[in-house]
Every structure is written in C-alpha cells, then in structure tokens.
Amino acid sequence: MADKQISLPAKLINGGIAGLIGVTCVFPIDLAKTRLQNQQNGQRMYTSMSDCLIKTIRSEGYFGMYRGAAVNLTLVTPEKAIKLAANDFFRYQLSKDGQQLTLFKEMLAGCGAGTCQVIVTTPMEMLKIQLQDAGRLAAQRKILSAQAQLSGQGSAQPSVEAPATPRPTATQLTRDLLRSRGIAGLYKGLGATLLRDVPFSIVYFPLFANLNELGRPASGEKSPFYVSFLAGCVAGSAAAVAVNPCDVVKTRLQSLQRGINEDTYSGFLDCARKILQNEGPSAFLKGAYCRALVIAPLFGIAQVVYFLGIAETLLGLPRVQP
C-alpha cells in the first residue's frame, strides 16, 4: 500500500480546479435555490427556478445572477480541495490493512471529509447567502414601496419614496461581522452546516465509489471519464436531495436580513419547528431540484478532474489508480 500513498498537493490542486469550473457553470442556479428557500408563505416573489432567474435578469441584469460568486470562487478552491483530499486521506488510512473498504468504512471516510470541510464552508455560505438574497429583499421593498405610494395617492400628503438600500459587499459583511460578533459571526449556522455536509458526504462518497466501480473495465484500469462524470452526477444529486431539509434550515439561519413579516429563528430546532408549523412539510424541499441541478454537474466535473489527474500531469507525478 505504500506505493499508492496519495499526493496531497495534487489532490488539493485537482479539487481547486474542479471547484472553480463547477461554480462558474452552476452559480445562477444556486442563487435561485437560495432565494426560493428564503421566501416564506405570504411573501412569495418567485414561483420557480426559471421565474426567479428571469426576474433577477430583469431587475439586476445578467450579472445579477452571479451576486456572491466572487466569494465562492475565492473559497471554493480550499473547500472542494479539503473535501476531496480529506476523503482520499481517510480512505487511504482505513485501507492500510490491505483489505477492500467496507461500506461502513467508506461512510466513515465520508463523515471525516464532511466534518473537515465546514471549516471553510460555513463562512463561505454565510457571506454568499447575504449577497445572493440581497436582490430578493430589495425587490420586495420596492414592491411594498410602490403599493404604499398607490394607497397614498388619495391622501393630501404626498408619499416620499424610500431611498434604495445600498447592497453589501463581501468585504463589508466580513468586517461588520468580525467587529460586531467576532470570528463566531462568520460561523453562524455551523451546527446546521455540519448536519447538512456530514450526512451529504456519508451518502455521496460511498455511492460515488460504488457507481464508479461498476464502470471499471475488467482489465482493472481506471473507469472512463464519462463513467466518473455520471457517477458524480447521480451520487451528487441523490445526496443533495437527501439532505435538502437541513439545507433549508441552514439557509434560513444564516440569513441576517429578513423581509417584511418573515419569521426569525433562535436555533436549528426552533427554525425547523416554525417552518413545519407555518409552511408545512413541503417547505423542507424548497429548492431541492435547484440544489440537485447545482450539485450534480458540480461533483460530476469535480470527479472528472480528480480522476483524470490533471494536477499529477502538471506536477509530473505518477497517477494513483483510484
């Protein structure tokens, strides 16, 4: 097994390359997911993913769909690199006895990977959600302001339009959170992130490994790239839908700004209880298909880059058979 020890720098580079490509491709869908998950009953501005994206383009322009992308593009490299490299590391450590990994050990490796990645994922998601949801809140205020003007047209005193709230930047948000809440401000929703990412990794990595194994040639060579891509897509979408209820709760908890008449939450259980009481069980599946559409190609691309060993080629290292 010693000759198969993984090259950590190569895995980190592969994970980073995959993350950058994937985020660039699917970020608008992720924005739609965040806005759909954050809108509550009685305050619905969007009826579907396509409706959200169309309204976003109309009100904020094409690049409005990429609000918060800079945060993801900056932090997705360490985030994806940690996730993939940690899973590889734990799988290697758990297979040192020369035995084939059991399903339990594969799930254990995935659990370790999911736990490691939240170091980067939590602040990344915290900042991204504020930037993504700012457009929804601004549009809601604009609609309410227009309604107030219409209702006040018959009054003697003319209504004054409220000044537009400046939209925050990632730097401003980070500075404000650190000043007001310290480092803990960037890690709000850490528990919910763990409850989402650990089960996701427990489902994703073993499912991917077994699906990828089905496409491995009888000669023992690595699976073709299209098999790795499809295995990543299927495993990613299945895991994403499975943990979507936790993702809805996490999104609500990490949203610092609320719309008119929207609930506030004191913690994970309080948030889950209020969603169930006020919006019903179906609310936990808000944005599920968006999340599946985001995760499927994101992890499909990641696994293709990872299994092609682009970094190994760049660094002149031998490819380790997965």
UniProtKB/Swiss-Prot annotation:
Annotated Gene Ontology cellular component terms: mitochondrial inner membrane
Keywords associated with the record: Membrane, Mitochondrion, Mitochondrion inner membrane, Repeat, Symport, Transmembrane, Transmembrane helix, Transport
Name of the protein this chain belongs to: Mitochondrial glutamate carrier 1
Top-rank lineage group of the source organism: Eukaryota
Protein's cellular compartments: Mitochondrion inner membrane
SUPFAM superfamilies with a match to the protein in the record: Mitochondrial carrier (SSF103506)
UniProt-listed GO biological process terms: aspartate transmembrane transport; L-glutamate transmembrane transport; malate-aspartate shuttle; regulation of insulin secretion
UniProt cross-references to Gene3D superfamilies, sorted A to Z: Mitochondrial carrier domain
The Solcar repeat ranges on this chain: 6-93, 101-214, 223-312
Membrane topology according to the record: Multi-pass membrane protein
GO molecular function, one term: L-aspartate transmembrane transporter activity
Protein's gene: SLC25A22
InterPro entries linked: Mit_carrier, Mito_Solute_Carrier, Mitochondrial_sb/sol_carrier, Mt_carrier_dom_sf
UniProt record similarity statement: Belongs to the mitochondrial carrier (TC 2.A.29) family.
Transmembrane segments: 12-32, 62-82, 107-127, 189-209, 223-243, 292-312
Keyword RNA-binding: no
KW Transmembrane helix (keyword) present: yes
Role: Mitochondrial glutamate/H(+) symporter. Responsible for the transport of glutamate from the cytosol into the mitochondrial matrix with the concomitant import of a proton. Plays a role in the control of glucose-stimulated insulin secretion.
Catalytic function, reaction form: L-glutamate(in) + H(+)(in) = L-glutamate(out) + H(+)(out)
